[in-house]
Amino acid sequence: MLNIIKSKIKNTYKKKALNDENVSFYNKNFVPAVRDWKNSIYVYNKNTLSLIPVASRLVMKLIKGYFNSYNLNIESKLRNKRLRRRYRKLSTNKIFISEGEFKHTNDKINITLYVYNKQKLNYLAKLKKKYTSLFGKDIFIKKLQLIKSKAIGILTQQQKKSKTLTNVLPKYSTKVNKIQNIYYRTYIKKSIKRLKYYMYYKQLLYINKAKFENSYLQGLIDLIKKIYKKNIEFNIINLKYLYFNSDIYTQPLVLKLRKKRDLLRYLKDLVNKAKIEKVSLNKRSEYYFNLENLFTRNNVDITNNLLNNLMQYNKKNSEYLKKVILNDIKYKRVSGVRLEAAGRLTKRYTASRSQYKFKYKGNLVNTYSSIQGYPSSLIRGNDKPNLQYTKLNSKSRIGSFGVKGWVSGV
């Protein structure tokens, strides 16, 4: 076995020069299988593989339907007009979800989802604009005191009037009390109207938060269990910005183009949202080893000694390990975005020609491999490991159209 390993190393690892004894290599960045195929699975019966794409598509429909659910009773109280179902589907006030990454094992499936919670941000912005500025000032306290003083004045006046009415009309005392109660209720509703709307927004925020809790996710997990007949585990990653995932980045463009075909404006708005900063390229560390001394007895326990020294060093300096881990993570920053849209996208309602527009910011080049010459692996076909690519299609009243999106990292 040792001879086979030695022969493989001699064939794969070549020296830089004939006189050079040490061989230097850079760490090659291998992309996980889930990132490549969206499904990572090994089965003995190959016929079961044909059912997996259908099952994953059905599961993604269930997940998107769960996160797009809403409370009609509360939302109707906040709106003057009823929102139609078509416009609700086209609204960007929702939780955007990427395509799921499914990792299959014998008894469990790990589903990774990237989420951008636009709905939560919208509700928080409305609360901040309308209510938090009001509650933090002295105006709100003065208003409460005014409501209190007016209410006490109204009560005293009504008590005097009710006494005179009961003396004059003793038979109608019950009706007088009912009218008084209606008057009090209308006064309370008008005075605490803004506070009522504040409570509705708080309820919607609670519903939004509850969608990510285990107690509410359990119903969704039970449905997915029936499809796969395995245990389900969710790994939900909340994204800070829209452009961190290409699936999420292209979804708002499709929704906006279905509602109103103003292509160039929407492309500019989405591309300008991407914040791309200048990134300094660091040199990657090399590791050296001697082929002749690789399998000697002295180097057998080298990993154990290395880990022992690292643990002792980390006891003194805990921040060192954090720096090492963060430096080893690849594609942490966004280096470029690109959006393309083509199809029946003119503003007229006639069978016009198709349009093609694109906008980009930054670059999509794999900088470490193309500029500095470091080795890098390829994903399925000729796709680059630093790129995320999404292709979506949809249709409007005058015809169909397609949208493509790229997000590159460095």
Swiss-Prot record:
Give a short account of what the protein does.
Essential for mitochondrial protein synthesis and required for the maturation of small ribosomal subunits.
Molecular function as annotated in GO: structural constituent of ribosome
Q: Where in the cell is it found?
A: Mitochondrion
Q: What is its main location?
A: mitochondrion
**Gene Ontology biological process terms in this record:** translation
Designated name of the protein: Small ribosomal subunit protein uS3m
What is any one of the record's Gene Ontology cellular component terms?
A: ribonucleoprotein complex
What keywords tag this UniProt record?
Answer: Mitochondrion, Ribonucleoprotein, Ribosomal protein
Q: Which InterPro entries match?
A: Ribosomal_uS3m_fun
Family note: Belongs to the universal ribosomal protein uS3 family.
Asked whether the UniProt record includes Ribonucleoprotein among its keywords, one would answer yes
